Swiss-Prot record:
Residues 80-200 form the SCP domain. InterPro entries: CAP_dom (IPR014044), CAP_sf (IPR035940), CRISP-related (IPR001283). Belongs to the CRISP family. PANTHER family: CYSTEINE-RICH SECRETORY PROTEIN-RELATED (PTHR10334). One of its GO terms (cellular component) is extracellular space. Highly expressed in the stigma and stylar cortex throughout pistil development. Not expressed in other organs. It comes from Solanum tuberosum (Potato). Disulfide bonds: none annotated. The gene is STS14. Residues 13-18 are annotated as: 3 X 2 AA tandem repeats of Y-I. This is STS14 protein.
Length: 214
């Protein structure tokens, strides 16, 4: 179509050129008009072609799919299930696993094993709530560690929000603390003897003085 239009414009141009020599002035005017019309037609044809090409532009590729969050490991899931079982028994919502807290506890337990002879860490000034367990003579699974903390439930008196007698129950109240929503835990086997050190962190921390856990 573009070639045909160009040829037609050239024929008009030649016809005007061989017109009467006495009308050179008229010829000159017509010649300019013809060139102008041809130029306008060329612009329209080019614009039409560009519009056609633009309409066929290939759309951008779709964004790459986002990867799903990595599920907790088997040990992490065992820690989580044992905690949430105890929380559900008193009507408290479940905790979620925090890779950040898990990393913090892993670094701490490794340090306590390598530098502190597998002793308890000082958690009194930490920004998270914390529970610890040291056990020897057997392999301690995550569920066994949590169950030993939950066993302190029998010492907790909800009515007056205190532990009975001289017994301790703070590790249990931290487990069921309603405002704590994230959990991270780690375990290490001690070098001397069959012993295991377990640490769990809770965020936000629980056991706030004057408040009930739930």
């Amino acid at each position: 179509m573009f070639v045909l239009s160009t040829a037609m414009a050239c024929l008009v141009y030649i016809y005007i050129y061989i017109y009467d020599e006495e009308k050179k002035r008229e010829l000159k005017v017509r010649n300019k008009m013809t060139n102008l019309l041809f130029f306008q037609f060329l612009l329209l044809t080019t614009a039409s072609s560009l519009t056609h090409i633009s309409a066929q532009t290939v759309p951008p590729p779709p964004p790459p799919p986002t990867s799903a969050a990595t599920p907790p490991s088997r040990a992490a899931q065992e820690f989580l299930d044992a905690h949430n079982k105890a929380r559900s028994e008193v009507g408290v919502g479940p905790l979620t696993w925090s890779p950040m807290l898990a990393k913090e506890t892993s670094l701490l337990v490794r340090y306590q094993r390598d530098k502190q002879n597998c002793s308890f860490a000082n958690l009194s000034n930490g920004k998270y709530g914390g529970n610890q367990l040291w056990a020897s003579g057997t392999v301690v699974t995550p569920r066994m560690a949590v169950d030993s903390w939950v066993a302190e439930k029998k010492f907790y008196n909800y009515e007056n929000n205190s532990c009975t007698g001289d017994d301790k129950c703070g590790v249990y109240t931290q487990i069921v603390w309603k405002k704590s929503i994230e959990l991270g835990c780690a375990q290490r086997t001690c070098y001397e003897g069959p012993a295991t050190l377990t640490v769990c962190f809770y965020n936000p921390p629980g056991n706030v003085i004057g408040e009930k856990p739930y």
